[in-house]
């Protein structure tokens, strides 16, 4: 996008029409006859002769295809595809051709194996635990299902996680790897009680036998053609994943088959003739168990083009700020800076880089914008200015000039904020120190020394006082990390932070209010506290910096009105005492001054700070604690606006501080949103990711703020930036200075070479997980969350009996507070659902299609009681699977409480 992109000519795409050697080939599986290998590359499925050569592309959709599974006769390949928003199981001819969709539930469904007779495909998915299951209800812990290879009703095989299934020839037993927890599957060298083990399941007896049972990773089992030997992947002997084997009858007699170093062996499979096949370091190998590995030489012909995306989003801002005059909104979206008009959709793109920009601040002149950018590998401060004086604002500007401030390759500077007079710029240095830059002299002074903030994940909240002489900030006192307090410190530098809260609990989001005479903040001191990192409930609080402001706040409505009248009279009296000639001159000056209230506001009074007794001037504003978002107090100091979530998203609440009256002002259902006032306090801006709106504070009327973005994104450059970002973050902030013995630079180079072979976010997230997995720490890895399901499956709030094979669906349990848990329903356990919206459910029917896109819509359910032979109908409103998940959690908590009563 910019000149920096020129260095990206490192082969990010293959030359059109020419054969290239692929890397990062995943989901490798050899055919049953051992002549071909199927694999996934760049989101498509290919196959190649086992001896190597040019691979044949089998899928050509824009969607992502992965996990090819051969049928026993080698004539079909099952695979996963996200063509409908989530991963479903499909099947296609082994030579390519039209694929048939087999699963329709909106959860992710990933194929594992064909049954030996080829009639069914087993897959893992989180659809429904058995009603009697005691497992924690989470989508991370899947169940095992099977679906006919020709299509039809899904049946549950196991109610517990069972991955990488491998059948014996008779189909009576199968091997599988378990899953006990949430650890990233690509983590390496992990030893704990939740690492995977290999199990043998006997379908006749229902018995599960743990064959490995150790605190280390053992996974991906395959059975030898004679059924006597288990081959699997393991990190035994202190190395990375390699192929090992043991006799099925004597699982303790483990021996190594391969001895690869540095990187893991992945995706083990075996042909009917006993040829092993697997992936290593992005390439494919075959091997006879008693021989040495052979790399399969592969070429792929692709007509790849440079990856650019033209994005035209209408929402999705990740941060936003309003200009002082209230006429412009600056926001970041996908890491770029944009400015839109508050009244029109006209929008200007300010930055064009693959790097991330963040931390927006308008100067008082409304023509200068400060932000931080990580371009060049280090967070730096930038100023964007409207170049031509003829251009009225950013959205309509023709030329934008950009300037980097205090350039450095080692010191990070971010989170800029202009001083009220626009002459200085505050910022956070190296994520822990508050600094101020004089924009004229370029001199920098230190406000805090970094000893009061310990987190390096980002900066901290701070705010200038209206007179520019103070900062309020969140800080950590007495090394009480991570519990932050609210502080006050001089903007001149060299001063100590005064702790204004001393609560011992989380306090944050400070901002000045009441013309700088008080500080508004939120705290969990009265609500649910984050003792175990399960979240907290907060209140809005004020700390008054002087007694006069506190006394004024404490006045009743009547006394407050009397005080305002008295102040008016005193002002008039002061005018009368002035000599006549001076009075005339003063009146002329006052008239001129009153004609421009903005100029008057530009000269704020000095704030009086009285620290003595300040601990007694801390006031709780909100009547009850809540999941609280942004808070702000009106210009006149009489109204508190705050965002709180009691059900669903965040809604806007309004509180009259004098009358102590609170009401729901607007139902917003917002994700995140920040609230800001324009300079005169006439408009309140609600700036969120889902929508941005402007509210007239006199009428409370909302007006939408729209924008028109047409941005061209270099996707390959974005991925390279993210890769570099991860490298730097780990290098700077990994808790262990030796990086757990990993040569981080060498490992980074090893994984960087795969970037040209990745053109989608699924593969990129997996690459990050593999790479970060080398460090062997929890809570790391890459994640990609697609936009969502195109056909979300609704829930009836029921458990079904998976052993039932007749017409309809047999209810095993009605979940409390679900759609059927009503006073008027006749539905109970044992009832059969025969039809949904008049469509009969036959024994072999896939009924999930009848529930897709039905959440929150009236649905007719036809029911039958096998005991009384009665039939009837009920109209219910299905819920989302997310809502059903919440009900299951409440049910699980009650059941576990009953277990210990």
Language-model-derived ranges and their functions:
Residues 21-22, 40-46, 59-65, 78-90, ...:
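A flexible loop/linker signature enriched in serine peptidases of the S9 family
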Residues 20-46, 315-335, 622-638:
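Beta-strand-rich domains and repeat architectures in extracellular enzymes and scaffolds
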Residues 756-807, 870-897:
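Extended, small/polar residue-biased N-terminal targeting/export presequences
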Residues 255-269, 498-509, 622, 629, ...:
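Conserved blade-ending motifs and adjacent loop-strand segments that build the rim/top face
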Residues 791-843:
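PDZ/PDZ-like domain segments forming the peptide/carboxylate-binding groove
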Residues 29-34, 68-76, 112-120, 165-173, ...:
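Blade-terminus and WD-like Trp-Asp/Gly-His loop motifs, strongest in beta-propeller folds
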Residues 297, 301-306, 561, 700-718, ...:
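C-terminal, low-ordered peptide segments at domain boundaries
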Residues 19-25, 53-55, 301-317, 398-405, ...:
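A short helix->beta-strand "capping" segment at the edge of beta-propeller domains
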């Amino acid at each position: 996008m910019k000149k920096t992109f020129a260095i990206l000519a490192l082969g990010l795409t293959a030359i059109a029409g020419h054969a290239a050697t692929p890397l990062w080939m995943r989901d490798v599986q050899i055919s049953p006859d051992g002549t071909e290998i199927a694999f996934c590359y760049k989101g498509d499925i290919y196959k190649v002769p086992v001896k190597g050569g040019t691979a044949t592309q089998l899928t050509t959709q824009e969607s992502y295809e992965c996990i090819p599974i051969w049928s026993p006769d080698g004539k079909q390949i099952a695979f996963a595809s996200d063509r409908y928003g989530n991963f479903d199981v499909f099947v296609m001819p082994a030579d390519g051709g039209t694929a048939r969709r087999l699963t329709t539930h909106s959860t992710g469904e990933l194929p594992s194996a064909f049954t030996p007779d080829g009639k069914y495909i087993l897959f893992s998915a989180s659809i429904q635990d058995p009603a009697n299951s005691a497992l924690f209800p989470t989508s991370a812990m899947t169940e095992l299902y099977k679906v006919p290879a020709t299509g039809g009703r899904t049946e549950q095989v196991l109610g517990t996680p069972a991955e990488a299934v491998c059948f014996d020839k008779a189909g009576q037993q199968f091997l599988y790897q378990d899953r006990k927890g949430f650890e990233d599957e690509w983590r390496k060298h992990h030893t704990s009680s939740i690492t995977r083990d290999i199990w043998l399941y006997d379908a006749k007896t229902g018995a599960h036998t743990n064959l490995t049972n150790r605190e280390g990773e053992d996974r991906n089992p395959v059975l030898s053609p004679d059924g006597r030997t288990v081959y699997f992947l393991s990190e035994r002997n202190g190395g990375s994943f390699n192929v090992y084997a043991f006799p099925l009858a004597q699982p303790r007699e483990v021996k190594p088959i391969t001895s690869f170093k540095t990187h893991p062996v992945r995706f083990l499979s075996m042909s009917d003739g006993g040829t092993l096949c697997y992936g290593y370091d992005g390439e494919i190998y075959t091997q006879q168990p008693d021989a040495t590995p052979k790399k399969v030489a592969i070429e792929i012909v692709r007509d790849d083009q440079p990856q650019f995306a033209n994005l035209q989003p209408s929402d999705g801002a990740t941060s936003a700020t309003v200009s002082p005059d209230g006429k412009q909104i600056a926001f970041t979206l996908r890491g770029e800076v944009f400015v839109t008009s508050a009244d029109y959709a006209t929008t200007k793109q300010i930055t064009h880089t693959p790097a991330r920009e963040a931390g927006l601040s308008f100067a008082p002149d409304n023509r200068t914008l400060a932000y931080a950018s990580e371009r060049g590998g280090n967070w730096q401060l930038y100023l964007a200015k409207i170049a031509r004086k003829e251009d009225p604002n950013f959205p309509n500007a023709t030329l934008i000039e950009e300037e980097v401030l205090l350039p450095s390759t080692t010191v990070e500077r971010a989170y800029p904020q202009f001083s009220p007079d626009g002459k200085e710029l505050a910022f956070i240095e190296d994520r822990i120190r508050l600094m101020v830059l004089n924009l004229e002299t370029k001199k920098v002074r230190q406000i805090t020394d970094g000893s009061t903030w310990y987190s390096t994940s980002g900066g901290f909240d701070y705010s200038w006082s209206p007179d520019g002489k103070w900062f309020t900030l969140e800080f950590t006192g007495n090394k009480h990390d991570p519990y932050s307090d609210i502080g006050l410190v001089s903007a001149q530098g060299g001063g100590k932070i005064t702790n204004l809260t001393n609560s011992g609990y989380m306090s944050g989001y400070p901002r000045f209010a009441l013309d700088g005479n008080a500080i508004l903040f939120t705290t969990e001191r009265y609500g649910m506290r984050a003792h175990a990192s399960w979240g907290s409930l907060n209140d809005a609080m004020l700390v008054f910096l002087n007694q006069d402001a506190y006394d004024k706040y404490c006045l009743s409505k009547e006394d407050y009105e009397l005080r305002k009248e008295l102040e008016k009279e005193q002002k008039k009296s002061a005018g009368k005492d002035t000599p006549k000639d001076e009075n005339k001159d003063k009146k002329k000056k006052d008239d001129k001054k009153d004609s421009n209230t903005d100029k008057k506001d530009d000269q704020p009074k000095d704030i009086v700070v009285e620290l003595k007794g300040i601990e007694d001037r801390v006031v709780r504003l909100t009547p009850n604690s809540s999941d609280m978002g942004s808070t702000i107090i009106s210009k006149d100091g009489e109204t508190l606006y705050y965002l709180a979530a009691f059900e669903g998203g965040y809604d806007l609440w309004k509180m009259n501080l004098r009358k102590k009256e609170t009401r729901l002002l607007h139902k917003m259902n917002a994700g995140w949103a920040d609230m800001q006032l324009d300079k005169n306090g006439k408009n309140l801006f609600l700036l969120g990711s889902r929508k941005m709106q402007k509210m007239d504070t006199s009428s409370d009327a909302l007006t939408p703020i729209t924008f028109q973005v047409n941005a061209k994104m270099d996707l390959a450059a974005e991925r390279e930036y993210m890769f570099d970002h991860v490298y730097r973050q780990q290098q700077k902030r990994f808790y262990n200075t030796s990086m757990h013995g990993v040569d981080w630079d060498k490992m980074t180079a090893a994984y960087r070479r795969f970037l040209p072979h990745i053109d989608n976010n699924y593969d990129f997230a997996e690459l990050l997980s593999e790479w970060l997995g080398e460090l062997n720490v929890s809570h790391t890895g890459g994640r990609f969350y697609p936009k969502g399901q195109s056909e979300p499956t609704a829930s009836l709030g029921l458990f079904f009996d998976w052993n039932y094979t007749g017409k309809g669906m047999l209810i095993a349990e009605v979940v409390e507070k679900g759609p059927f848990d009503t006073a008027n329903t006749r539905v109970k356990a044992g009832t059969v659902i025969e039809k949904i919206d008049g469509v009969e459910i036959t024994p072999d029917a896939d009924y999930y299609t009848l529930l897709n896109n039905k959440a929150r819509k009236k649905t007719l359910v036809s029911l039958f009681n096998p005991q009384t032979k009665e039939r009837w109908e009920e109209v219910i409103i299905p819920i989302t699977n997310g809502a059903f998940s919440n009900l299951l959690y409440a049910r699980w908590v009650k059941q576990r409480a009953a277990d210990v009563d």
